[in-house]
């Protein structure tokens, strides 16, 4: 029968409490995976056939989150337009996180390093390693946090992206098989929380 899905609350934010946390967001946990959803504001235009409801998954074993962004373009508050690559519809955006657990409440904070993982055969694209280095250099992140983050990131890459020494034609386990049941669930929220960022 397998593990049962349990309801949890999720808070999300930037590293070290810079800015307010967003939440609580209703979510679910199945084994070592959490899924939660929130609605993007109207300035985000969804891909055809999709809504502004964004589902994010968190792999607790390595402390990373990932989502298949539901939007194709957005108008930023300064009036500029950010447009996704048309090939990006089925790509995944992955973030390294810190994870804090208090009962059934999970707080996830961004830990700078990101990777975009396409599912159409293109290579992945690493981002924000410079921000990670800056946080270590200026003391925003402790040395111990930095070491832990890099070790978990390498475990993620080895376990889910390339588990052989030499890269294969596809990803080892991405999107991970462990998220399949949560991916297939209908909408998790009856009244989604809207992000106003």
Regions found by a protein language model. Give the residues of each.
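Cysteine/selenocysteine-centered motifs that mediate thiol-based redox chemistry or coordinate metal-sulfur cofactors
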Residues: 152-197
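Intrinsically disordered terminal and processing segments
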Residues: 34, 39, 44-48, 52-59, ...
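A long amphipathic alpha-helix within ATP-dependent nucleotide-binding catalytic cores
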Residues: 95-97, 101, 106, 150-163
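Structured beta-strand/loop patches that form or line metal/cofactor-binding pockets in enzymes
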Residues: 56-113
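Charge-rich, low-complexity N-terminal segments
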Residues: 1-56
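Short, well-ordered loop/turn elements at secondary-structure boundaries
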Residues: 30, 87-88, 118-120
């Amino acid at each position: 029968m397998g593990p049962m899905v349990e309801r949890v609350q999720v808070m999300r934010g930037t590293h070290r409490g810079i800015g307010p946390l967003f939440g609580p967001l209703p979510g679910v946990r199945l084994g070592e995976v959490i899924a939660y959803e929130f609605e993007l504001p109207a300035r985000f235009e969804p891909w055809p056939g999709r809504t502004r409801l964004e589902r994010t998954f968190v792999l607790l074993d390595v402390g990373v989150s990932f989502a298949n962004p539901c939007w194709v373009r957005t108008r930023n508050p300064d009036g500029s337009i950010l447009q996704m690559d048309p090939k990006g519809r089925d790509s995944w955006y992955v973030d390294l996180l810190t994870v804090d657990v208090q009962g059934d409440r999970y707080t996830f904070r961004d830990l700078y390093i990101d990777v975009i993982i396409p599912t159409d055969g293109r290579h992945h694209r690493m981002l924000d390693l410079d921000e990670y280095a800056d946080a270590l250099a200026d003391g925003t992140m402790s040395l111990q946090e930095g070491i832990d983050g890099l070790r978990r990131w390498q475990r993620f890459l080895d376990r889910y992206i390339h588990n052989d020494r030499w890269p294969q034609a596809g990803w080892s386990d991405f999107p991970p098989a462990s998220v399949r049941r949560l991916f297939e669930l209908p909408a998790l929220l009856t009244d989604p929380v809207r992000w106003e960022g």
